[in-house]
């Protein structure tokens, strides 16, 4: 936090004064209105949904929060994620992050932020980055297939997700495991008014190209499909087409093959097309109502996509086979029953497809069994729901939220207070509501609502939703958290909001009225065996794999567990998993029901604060201790801080802890010694201990390094000394041997030479063999002298362009002749350069630069070679009015020329004056005396020019340039070679970078309205000067004809 920036309100509610419900809500409102959406209760983060993107996320903030402790910066979800990650890495303790709140409170976004933070701060490397990318890319896939727009949330999770991210001992991710809970598959066939089906259906229709839609036999119009709510086909702020492409990319990153992606989309399309199967009454001779399919083409297309005969598929939808002993009886279904079978098939296909996708993701991100790993769990599960019509789905969703609230109560409120009591720490009890009685009402194994629902589903006889409700009224009419019409009548209460087919439970979040209609069917979740067997016969590989029970060889008459039992067991496993980890809480709050930014509804927030138990949590944290740990692990971690306990301590663990803390300057109020644990009141004290430990570790590391280096140097010295003595002895002996050998060889050699010399001296006068060598040397020297004198007389002129050179008279002098020619030419060039003025040097450099840029590329370049670069073509030096265009720019004007600017809208040209200085490009109307456009050379990203005889060029500006808000500029100049050459040199001098000069007939320019493709073509040859004709070809193309 910047030093001069004060906090808005109270950042940690533990410090709130006075502490009551009203001040708590006002503090949250004050922070929310100032866009401070995060608030602490100790190490619990309260997150308010801002319903807008705030500039408080990204790499910059991640880097900031990873370098500071929890309370040193503003409250943020990154701070909690950092604490959880560091605890997992440093303390070797598995973590879980529990994200709770109502639907629409921002839980899904919070889980994404946690995962993105962990992915950013953990290790690097090719394999690690691949794992991180797969974990992150699982989110868009699961959101597409498991999220939908509801009345209260445009991106509501309609399933529960718990992800275990697994790390190695260094804190680098190895992979993960995703567990999903109770997909709301009834949404596949029916949605409430104002809601949508799952996102993937709309994304597929909006984002698939025409070829893919044709292959899937789909139409782009959502109103065509019976399973899609045509009234709400689009959601504000959500681009279904781009999201579809993102889902395809994410599936590829995770590891889905192209074939698997295609099969997933085919099965998704099948679900859509099943909703368009029209069923009609058919006449039978026996008078029994029957049904048939009136759209033969539609069922035939579905059969082709499944790889089934359409007749067989129709039979499975319109009839049912009943097995009685060894006999099979086929009964026809009426239209209502057939529609139920069709919808059940669609729901089961989609639900099993979703489970298959989760399983497939887990196969890609799973970790090998042999690796030791640490685990961080992230729970993103549907929020508490209170709708106008609450059914079985809302019942199990709210049951799950009750269990999560129970976890929070037991681990933060109840467990903490009981721990103080066990440890003998003085404590003032804080009252709170324990929702265990509600959980027991729902999940009791024998007398719970779920148990009664299963019993009703399994018992013989006539079973209906009303008999189930009657059983509940019989058992729970006197329960304090259960209400129904029967219990109200018995107590002479009159409530018109309570229907005859409804019951009400007083949840921790408020009272919810449930309509029992459909409870029995949804709990049974039955799919006729004929449909399973028919799907197993399908030739579509993915569809067939979704229905293994359809295999006649593996058919089982055992009744599958009910949906309620499956969900109850899954929640029990989840609770066991959460209890085994250290919890970190994010409590999400929805500020208003209209999803509007900046709007704070105090009553709504107060209700959520009450059932989340925020006030009780503050009181417990305020009266308690922020950190506690057993004496033994605490001593193991911090014993190095005291000389009494380091390096060895053989006494009692508690006594050792007292020695450690006694050696530090800590207040006695900050510490409390329990029976088995040490309690520390303030997080700042814990941070102080960690800082002292870090400094002590540095000291110990230095000490270890010092001792090791000393030992290594002593050992090395001893080895070197021993080796040196041995080497010296061998070396001296060998040196003497070699010295004696050399002396002896030298003596013998000298004797031989002396004898030879004496012999040659005595007998030289008798031999003439030396005369030939003397004559040869004389002749060769004479030829060389003649060659050099002749070359001196016939030297060519000192003109640089004169490349003549006399030939060598003999072949033996060819190499020397070539080298002399090279040296003479270099000498001529140096003489020529020494005679040039600075202006002539600059002119030649410009010509050289033009040659490098345009020679062999631009057709008009040869004509520009003999013409000197003038620079001023408008008489700038003699015109004070034009000189004012230069403004305060210092230095000379490199180019002053009249150019034509091409209009972005219609391609017409208009005259402009262009000035090029050492720092800017200035454009103005020829009739005005003030600069209209001033572009810094650092904003010029490049230029594009054609290879023809024209003078058209595009001035490309960097995207971050603020000089021209309308984008790039198209200009026409009669001196394009000179202008671009000098601009290239000016950019190089001003920015130390080379300007990109592209010579091409096709290039793209960026205008405010978007990119425009410019194409330059050669028209029929015209007389006189070259003419350019610019024409717009639609909104995204322009054609320039050179005549």
Curated annotation (Swiss-Prot):
Function: Involved in directing the movement of organelles along actin filaments.
Residue stretches spanning the membrane: none
Family the UniProt entry places it in: Belongs to the TRAFAC class myosin-kinesin ATPase superfamily. Myosin family.
Stored Gene3D superfamilies: 1.10.10.820, 1.20.5.190, 1.20.58.530, 6.20.240.20, Kinesin motor domain, Myosin VI head, motor domain, U50 subdomain
Example GO molecular function: actin filament binding
Stretches for region Actin-binding: 571-593
Residue span, TH1 domain: 858-1042
A GO term from the CC aspect: basal plasma membrane
Organism: Mus musculus (Mouse)
BP-aspect Gene Ontology terms: cell projection organization; microvillus assembly; sensory perception of sound; vesicle localization
CDD domains in the cross-refs: MYSc_Myo1
Protein name (record): Unconventional myosin-Ia
Coiled coil: none
UniProt key word rRNA-binding: no
Keyword terms of this UniProt record: Actin-binding, ATP-binding, Calmodulin-binding, Motor protein, Myosin, Nucleotide-binding, Phosphoprotein, Repeat
InterPro entries noted in UniProt: IQ_motif_EF-hand-BS (IPR000048), Kinesin_motor_dom_sf (IPR036961), Myosin_head_motor_dom-like (IPR001609), Myosin_TH1 (IPR010926), MYSc_Myo1 (IPR036072), P-loop_NTPase (IPR027417)
């Amino acid at each position: 936090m910047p030093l001069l920036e004060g906090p808005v309100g109270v950042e940690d509610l533990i410090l709130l004064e006075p502490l009551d419900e009203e001040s708590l809500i006002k503090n949250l409102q004050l922070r929310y209105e100032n866009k401070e959406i995060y608030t602490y209760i100790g190490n619990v983060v309260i997150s308010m949904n801002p319903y807008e993107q705030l500039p408080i996320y990204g790499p910059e903030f991640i880097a900031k929060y990873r370098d500071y402790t929890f309370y040193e910066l503003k409250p943020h979800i990154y701070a909690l994620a950092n604490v959880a990650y560091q605890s997992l890495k440093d303390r070797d303790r598995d973590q879980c992050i529990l994200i709770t709140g109502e639907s629409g409170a921002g839980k899904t976004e919070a889980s994404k932020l946690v995962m993105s933070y962990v992915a950013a701060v953990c290790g690097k490397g090719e394999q690690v980055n691949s794992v991180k990318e797969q974990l992150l890319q699982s989110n868009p896939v699961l959101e597409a297939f498991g999220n939908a727009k509801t009345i209260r949330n445009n991106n509501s999770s309609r399933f529960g997700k718990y992800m275990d991210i697994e790390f190695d001992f260094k804190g680098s991710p190895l992979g993960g495991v995703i567990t999903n809970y109770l997909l709301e598959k009834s949404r596949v066939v029916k949605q409430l008014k104002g809601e949508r089906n799952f996102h993937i259906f709309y994304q597929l229709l909006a984002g698939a190209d025409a070829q893919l839609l044709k292959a899937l036999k789909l139409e782009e119009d959502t109103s065509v499909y019976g399973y899609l709510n045509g009234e709400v086909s689009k959601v504000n702020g959500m681009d279904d087409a781009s999201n579809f492409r993102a889902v395809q990319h994410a599936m590829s990153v995770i590891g889905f093959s192209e074939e698997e992606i295609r099969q997933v989309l085919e099965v998704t399309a099948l679900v859509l097309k099943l909703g368009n199967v029209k069923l009609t009454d058919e006449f039978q001779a026996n008078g029994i109502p029957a049904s048939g399919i009136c759209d033969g083409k539609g069922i035939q297309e579905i059969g082709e996509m499944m790889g089934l005969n359409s007749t067989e598929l129709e039979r499975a939808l319109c009839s049912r086979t009943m097995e009685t002993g060894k006999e099979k009886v086929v009964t026809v279904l009426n239209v209502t029953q057939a529609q139920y079978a069709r919808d059940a098939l669609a729901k089961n296909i989609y639900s099993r497809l979703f489970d298959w996708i989760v399983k497939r993701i887990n196969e890609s991100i799973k970790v090998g069994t042999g690796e030791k790993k640490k685990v961080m769990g992230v729970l993103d599960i549907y929020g508490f729901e209170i709708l106008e019509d609450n059914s079985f789905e809302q019942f199990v969703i709210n049951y799950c939220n009750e269990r999560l609230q129970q976890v929070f109560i037991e681990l933060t409120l109840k467990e903490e207070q009981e721990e103080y009591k066990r440890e003998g720490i003085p404590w003032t009890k804080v009252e709170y509501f324990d929702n265990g009685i509600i959980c027991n009402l729902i999940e009791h194994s024998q007398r719970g609502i779920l148990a009664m629902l299963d019993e009703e589903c399994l018992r013989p006889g006539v079973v209906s939703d009303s008999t189930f409700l009657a059983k509940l009224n019989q058992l729970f009419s006197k329960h304090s958290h259960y209400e129904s019409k029967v219990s109200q009548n018995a107590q002479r209460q009159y409530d018109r909001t309570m229907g005859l087919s409804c019951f009400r439970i007083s949840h921790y979040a408020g009272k919810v009225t449930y309509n029992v209609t459909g409870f029995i069917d949804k709990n049974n979740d039955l799919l006729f065996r004929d449909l399973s067997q028919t799907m197993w016969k399908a030739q579509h590989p993915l569809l067939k794999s979704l229905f293994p029970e359809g295999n006649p060889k593996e058919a089982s008459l055992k009744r599958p567990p009910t949906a309620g039992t499956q969900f109850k067991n899954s929640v029990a496993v989840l609770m066991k998993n959460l209890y085994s980890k250290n919890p970190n809480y994010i409590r999400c709050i929805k500020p208003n029901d209209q999803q509007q930014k900046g709007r704070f509804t105090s009553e709504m927030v107060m209700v959520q604060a009450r059932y989340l138990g925020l006030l009780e949590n503050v009181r417990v944290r305020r009266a308690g201790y922020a950190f506690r740990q057993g004496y033994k692990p605490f001593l193991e971690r911090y014993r190095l801080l005291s000389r009494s306990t380091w390096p060895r301590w053989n006494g009692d663990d508690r006594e050792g802890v007292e020695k450690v803390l006694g050696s530090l300057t800590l207040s006695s109020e900050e510490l409390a010694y329990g029976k088995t644990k040490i309690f520390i009141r303030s997080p700042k004290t814990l941070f102080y201990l960690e800082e002292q430990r870090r400094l002590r570790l540095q000291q110990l590391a230095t000490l270890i390094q010092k001792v090791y280096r000393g030992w290594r140097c002593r050992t090395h010295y001893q080895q070197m000394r021993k080796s040196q003595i041995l080497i010296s002895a061998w070396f001296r002996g060998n040196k003497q041997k070699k010295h004696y050998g050399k002396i002896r060889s030298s003596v013998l050699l000298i004797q031989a030479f002396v004898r030879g010399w004496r012999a040659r001296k005595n007998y030289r006068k008798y031999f003439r063999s030396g005369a030939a060598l003397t004559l040869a040397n004389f002749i060769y020297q004479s030829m060389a002298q003649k060659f050099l004198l002749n070359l001196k007389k016939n030297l060519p002129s000192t003109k640089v362009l004169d490349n003549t050179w006399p030939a060598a008279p003999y072949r033996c002098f060819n190499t020397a002749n070539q080298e002399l020619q090279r040296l003479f030419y270099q000498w001529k060039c140096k003489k020529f350069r020494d005679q040039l003025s600075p202006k002539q040097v600059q002119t030649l450099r410009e010509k050289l630069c033009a040659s490098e840029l345009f020679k062999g590329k631009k057709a008009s370049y040869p004509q520009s070679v003999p013409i000197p670069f003038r620079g001023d073509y408008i008489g700038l030096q003699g015109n004070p009015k034009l000189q004012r265009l230069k403004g305060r720019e210092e230095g000379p004007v490199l180019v002053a020329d009249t150019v034509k600017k091409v209009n972005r809208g219609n391609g017409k040209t208009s005259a402009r004056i262009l000035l090029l200085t050492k720092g800017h490009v200035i454009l103005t109307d020829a009739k005005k005396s003030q600069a209209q456009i001033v572009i810094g050379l650092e904003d010029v990203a490049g230029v594009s020019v054609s290879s023809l005889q024209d003078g058209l060029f595009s001035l490309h500006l960097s995207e971050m340039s603020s000089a021209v808000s309308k984008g790039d500029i198209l200009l026409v100049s009669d001196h394009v070679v000179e202008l671009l050459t000098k601009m290239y040199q000016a950019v190089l001098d001003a920015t130390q970078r080379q300007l990109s000069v592209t010579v091409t007939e096709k290039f793209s320019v960026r205008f405010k309205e978007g990119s425009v493709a410019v194409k330059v073509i050669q028209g029929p040859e015209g007389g006189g000067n070259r003419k350019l004709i610019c024409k717009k070809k639609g909104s995204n193309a322009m054609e320039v004809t050179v005549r």
